[in-house]
Amino acid sequence: MAMRPGPLWLLGLALCALGGGHGPRPPHTCPQRRLGARERRDMQREILAVLGLPGRPRPRAQPAAARQPASAPLFMLDLYHAMTDDDDGGPPQAHLGRADLVMSFVNMVERDRTLGYQEPHWKEFHFDLTQIPAGEAVTAAEFRIYKEPSTHPLNTTLHISMFEVVQEHSNRESDLFFLDLQTLRSGDEGWLVLDITAASDRWLLNHHKDLGLRLYVETADGHSMDPGLAGLLGRQAPRSRQPFMVTFFRASQSPVRAPRAARPLKRRQPKKTNELPHPNKLPGIFDDGHGSRGREVCRRHELYVSFRDLGWLDWVIAPQGYSAYYCEGECAFPLDSCMNATNHAILQSLVHLMKPDVVPKACCAPTKLSATSVLYYDSSNNVILRKHRNMVVKACGCH
């Protein structure tokens, strides 16, 4: 009875080995074939597991009028480029060096107590935290709101304070927890960043799924001011200037993947002989090319993962694919310095010469791995930036 191809074999079909070049797409000379529906599903499931995702995210489609770039995705795309530059040896960015995961949250509900109400005036924002993953430690959290220049009053000092709404009450003021205070001029323009990291312990310990933030504005002489008159924009602002929250996480441990069934290994039976091979027949010493004629020595080869070909560009923002690479080649004695061989690999190769049926050759394997970053939408339309460690082969060697 014919066996159905396993997921690892199908994964190999999704990853295209290249002859050379480092473009965003593999060259047309790369061997490819169209996968069947069942193969495609198995392959997608396997790669999702590698990416640490339980399933394929399915973000809600945006109406045509709302498809102009929004503030959170634009900011997260800048973070993605900064994280990519950091992985390539660029200057480290604030919070990014310690973060494995960055999540943005869009303001879901907004309430105001402004003109016509009793003072103090305030603006309140609410965020849905149901998508925060378990087992992640918060390293930093920020609230970002855009400020336009204000002439009411002209060129005066403003104090912007942020509080967490701990508990709401129907007959009295809500219980608040102070988070941050920023001082600026009324004529300033740009993104105002408020540190809300202190609120993260409450989310994680109490498993709160709704975060309320309240913002107050005061003048230098202590008078309460309508945040809108101070130039602070809310949900009615253009999409590229709407407020949002960003949280940086670091995984407490590597995600555990579900084990796959594996066939038991068959032990090779050694040949019964008391004679050593003839000296001129020792594999690897006198042959050109270190081993089987025509075989290349251990080195790195290119391997490309295409999210476009997987049909995932409806939720993957960047990249469209990436070069993962793989290691392949001979590790036959003598092992040159270019093979990055370990002392154990050299010893194993020597013993293999004497007893090739008992001790195998050293293996060509990665000696250095690096991370790759993926920016995508989750099923709640939050934008996620996740750094996946040990996903790209940087160097190969004999082990």
Swiss-Prot record:
Residues 1-19 form the signal peptide. It holds the Pfam family TGFb_propeptide. SMART domains: TGFB. InterPro entries: Cystine-knot_cytokine (IPR029034), TGF-b_C (IPR001839), TGF-b_propeptide (IPR001111), TGF-beta-rel (IPR015615), TGFb_CS (IPR017948). Keywords: Chondrogenesis, Cytokine, Developmental protein, Differentiation, Disulfide bond, Glycoprotein, Growth factor, Osteogenesis, Secreted, Signal. PROSITE patterns: TGF_BETA_1, TGF_BETA_2. Residues 257-286 are annotated as: Disordered. Glycans are attached at N155, N340. This is Bone morphogenetic protein 8A. It comes from Mus musculus. The gene is Bmp8a.
